[in-house]
């Protein structure tokens, strides 16, 4: 490109920046755009599947799946990781179902978590917009899109038809929110449920409520499913879960991650490190025995998990070796998250 054209472009860009502010226009190769900052999900295999070490800042993320598959659990882990980095987090509880005890057990600082339980879908999305525009929130979770009921539906009679109201509401909200989310580097996580299309004979009958807008605006979409129940003798102690990254605008999509969600504990970090460590040949498995170099971790996966729980330094060493292999940020040794108080109901959200 000749110098005259370059000068004209620079002059135009300078004029646009004066009129609309710094960051209104830029060249794509500028360094601060190329590096996409991410917040960890608290699950090593999911961070690897997402390709950038977590969920991207300044983007919309959708987590959807059947009931009790672990959607809220994954979202709460992301909130906890954001708070550990010194960030502020907000939770729009449209379902009115947030369990503070469970959130605390997952590592969420509930004393500093901003929570809203809105009456209508419009109110929920206006609160979300105000929080995003403040520029102070790092992660905001909306739980769930299906529970964002338009005001007209709440004030109307039971049985009244309100076709397309929720879809229009979501479309309008996302048009307004996307720019603010990007500028403030906030992560907006929308949790969504599943519905079935009526009369579908071929293809996948499953769909998510709230219209198509969220599918378009989301940079990352995660489909989370329970694939097995974890038992200790006859007692059920958790779920084995598979997450498929069905859309990813910041890394290659369609990668999968499997991990354990233990009741009252959340994602099993130790179990995840054992699984990924064996896959990457950092942990050796011989018969039922697991070992790391000359260190015997235990006989059976549960004993290996127990060893890592009791030896945090070795667990962190193994985790960081895996992270180095995938060019993910190195984790510092942290204290264990608090245990949930006795008497709290067993539940995987």
Curated annotation (Swiss-Prot):
Pfam families: RecA, RecA_C
GO CC annotations, alphabetized: cytosol
Keywords: ATP-binding, Cytoplasm, DNA damage, DNA recombination, DNA repair, DNA-binding, Nucleotide-binding, SOS response
Keyword ATP-binding: yes
InterPro entries: AAA+_ATPase, DNA_recomb/repair_RecA, DNA_recomb/repair_RecA_CS, P-loop_NTPase, RecA-like_C, RecA-like_N, RecA_ATP-bd, RecA_C_sf
Annotated residues for binding of ATP: 65-72
SMART domains associated with the record: AAA
GO molecular function, one term: ATP binding
Subcellular localization: Cytoplasm
GO annotation (BP), single: SOS response
Segments traversing the membrane: none
Superkingdom of source: Bacteria
Role description: Can catalyze the hydrolysis of ATP in the presence of single-stranded DNA, the ATP-dependent uptake of single-stranded DNA by duplex DNA, and the ATP-dependent hybridization of homologous single-stranded DNAs. It interacts with LexA causing its activation and leading to its autocatalytic cleavage.
Family per record: Belongs to the RecA family.
The name this protein goes by in its record: Protein RecA
Species per Swiss-Prot/TrEMBL record: Clostridium acetobutylicum (strain ATCC 824 / DSM 792 / JCM 1419 / IAM 19013 / LMG 5710 / NBRC 13948 / NRRL B-527 / VKM B-1787 / 2291 / W)
Organism classification: Bacteria, Bacillati, Bacillota, Clostridia, Eubacteriales
């Amino acid at each position: 490109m000749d110098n005259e054209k370059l000068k004209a472009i620079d002059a135009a860009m300078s004029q646009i920046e004066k009129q609309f502010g710094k960051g209104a226009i830029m060249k794509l190769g500028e360094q601060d755009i190329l590096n996409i900052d991410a917040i960890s999900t608290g699950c090593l295999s999911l961070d690897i599947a997402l390709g950038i070490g977590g969920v991207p800042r300044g983007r919309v993320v959708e987590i959807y799946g059947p009931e009790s598959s672990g959607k809220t659990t994954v979202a709460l882990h992301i909130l906890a990781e954001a708070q550990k980095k010194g960030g502020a987090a907000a939770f729009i509880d449209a379902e009115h179902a947030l369990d503070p005890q469970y959130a605390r057990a997952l590592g969420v600082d509930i004393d500093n978590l901003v929570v809203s339980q809105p009456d209508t879908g419009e109110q929920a999305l206006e609160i979300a917009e105000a929080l995003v525009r403040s520029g102070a929130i790092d992660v905001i979770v909306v739980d769930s899109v299906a529970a964002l009921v338009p005001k007209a539906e709440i004030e109307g009679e039971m049985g009244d038809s309100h076709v397309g109201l929720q879809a229009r509401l979501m479309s309008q909200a996302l048009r307004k929110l996307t720019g603010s989310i990007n500028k403030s580097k906030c992560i907006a996580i929308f949790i969504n449920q599943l519905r079935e299309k009526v009369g579908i004979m071929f293809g996948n009958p499953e769909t998510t409520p709230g219209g198509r807008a969220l599918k378009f605006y989301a940079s990352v979409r995660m489909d989370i499913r329970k694939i097995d129940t974890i038992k200790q003798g006859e007692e059920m102690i958790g779920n084995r879960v598979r997450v498929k990254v069905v859309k990813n605008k910041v890394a290659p999509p369609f990668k999968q991650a499997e991990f354990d969600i233990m009741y009252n504990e959340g994602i099993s970090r130790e179990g995840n490190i054992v699984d990924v460590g064996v896959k990457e040949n950092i942990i050796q498995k011989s018969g039922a025995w697991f070992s790391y170099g000359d260190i015997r971790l235990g006989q059976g996966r549960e004993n290996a998990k127990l060893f890592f729980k009791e030896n945090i330094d070795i667990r962190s060493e193994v985790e960081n070796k895996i992270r180095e292999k995938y060019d993910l940020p190195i984790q510092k040794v942290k204290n264990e998250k608090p245990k949930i108080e006795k008497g709290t109901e067993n539940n995987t959200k």
